Amino acid sequence: MSTALGTELRPALPRDQWNTTEMGRFLEKIENTYGVHFENYDQAWAWSVANLDDFWQQIWDHFEIISHAPHTAVLGSRTMPGAQWFPGARINFAEHIHRALVEHADVPILINRSQTTGSSEWTGQQLLDEIAALRTGLIAQGIGEGDRVVGYLPNIPQTVALYFATASLGAIWCSVPPEMGPQSVLDRIEQLDPSLIVAIDGYKWGAKSISRADELDRIRAALPAMKAVVLPYLDAECEIPAGALSYAEFTKNTAPMEFVPVAFEYPLVILFSSGTTGKPKAIVHCHGGLLLEHYKDISLQFDITDRDRTFWYSTTGWMVWTLSVSSLLVGAAMVLMDGDPGWPALDGEWSQWAVLAETKSTYLTTGSAYLAVCAHSGLTPGKTWDLSRLREIQCSGSPLAADVAGWVYAEVGPDLMLAPASGGTDICSGFVCGSPLSPVNAGEMAVRPLGAAVYSWGPDGQEVSGEPGELVCVAPLPSMPAFFWGDENFDRYTASYFDTWPGIWRHGDWLIHTERNTWAITGRSDATLNRGGVRLGTAEFYAILDPRPELKDSLVLHFEDPDGGMGVLALLAVANGELDKEATEKALKTFIRTELSPRHVPDVIIWVPSVPRTATGKRLEIPLKRLVQGINTGNTIDRGVLVHPEDLDGIVAALKAVLA
């Protein structure tokens, strides 16, 4: 399996066939309205960023946004941070979901595949009924506008319904996946002072049953004012904890649906950053921002319609989950899977390919790392399963290697639209992605999304090509965060994105603009780790490792694997004397898995005499990583600032040996 970087795997759609796609039809409206003509996607992109007000007004009109009051402008202010979108409008995200479900009331809309409870299907009407019952239950518990509702739930229909029920009230949704340990959960939701949590009792991961009862008890003990509802999932007869409601009791009544109109910028959902420099940042996304951005993504960039059956493999803690349920905006059916896709084997009945075939799905979103594992394992999905209905694969979470892209076309389907993408929790969307109009080149991403003024900049703030630069966005996007929870003065917000160039969003990814006018992400330019698309902050590791008596110090690094894998390495220094390193490593991995999540478990533990720190105590993660990689970015280590400079060469040698 060998495919050269940049090899064209799928040609651009001929111009006279654009009207076979949702994007093509939308762009024809633009051409007719403004008297312009686009020969290719890049010309359309250039128009969209040069005419932001007109472009986003056309998105608003094209998708018939329901507003209970007129807006007075498209962009009242372009200042970043703080851009003011559609001032005066009064909308509700959930009302648009409701409209689509009413139009698809009698067809299967959620196709559920769970290793815990088996298979089920919900029609649009069943989902509407569940949303109404949950909304009634929330009201009965005193939940209203501005309250925070937490779901400690897997990717199942009830989670989807709870999100939209919460949104309908003007309450704020927050999801933490059940594989997260109690400390990871509390690091996130304690910031929010949530009013209510809905949690499962446990779940199955492959053949293993995992209870969440003790974890929920610990979470509730830390937040005694928070009300709790338990959904029996692992055990239908599970005991409901004292002071909590059963899901059945919570949803026993139903009242007619209503929607609280809110301002465009009003909070809809809180997603969490990785926690690189402390507790994870609580990133607030607004009703209007996600509504417009997700309509654009789902319909135009992804070319999804109500004729599609979409399968997004995602944990509920990933921003992809929040994006995935927005496919309901256009009436597309969703396949929900909760379980281990590698059980009982990579080519077994729970393989993502098997689920795709069995559910007759037309669209897949998965992790690039999953595609890499399948490719390197010699799987031939197109021969093993009937994937004749599959027409598109989106992948994200890490760069997709050229060889793996070639494998997709050779072994999955020769006519697919393969669309690697990269964006983030920060915008709950993409900065570079695919397009149904554009060619597919191995190891690269095709385009910048319409309306996204994305560039690669060098240190001098000028565009660069053919080499890594900082991914920047020089104009507002509707889905940029409204604010960070608890960051009243925008201090953390500004420091996160605007500390390098005032008024310019710096995302923290290295981005290459290629000679083919395509795009490639080569890794993070900050200390955030990336495990299969879920960004993990080093501060989360240190919060639980620092108190360990057997450890003197620790440092966690991430190295991108060019073949699509991800390597998380932990450098550990022993506190006193000798210890059984094999047993300690096993115990520490179990501890990390329990307290944080399986994604946090390091691939390799390296024992070192010390970790690189300055005299002020700062861990030198990025400088050490750059030194090992041989990258001269001006951040290589000045030995004079190190507490133990004599240990540095040995640490670098140990890292290089592991990475060799």
Label each region the model flagged.
Residues 227, 555-561, 569-571, 589-660:
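Conserved C-terminal "lid"/linker of ANL adenylate-forming enzymes
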Residues 300, 391-518, 525-528, 541:
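Conserved AMP-binding/adenylate-forming
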Residues 154, 196-215, 235, 338-341, ...:
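Adenylate-forming
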Residues 291-309, 319-362, 377-378:
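Conserved AMP-binding/adenylation subdomain of ANL enzymes
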Residues 42-47, 94, 110-164, 181-186, ...:
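Conserved AMP-binding/adenylate-forming core of the ANL superfamily
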Residues 168-249, 368:
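Structural core segment of the AMP-binding/adenylate-forming
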Residues 106-108, 230, 241-272, 279, ...:
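Conserved pre-ATP/AMP-binding loop-to-beta segment of ANL
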Residues 151, 176, 180-201, 216, ...:
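AMP-binding/adenylate-forming catalytic core of the ANL superfamily
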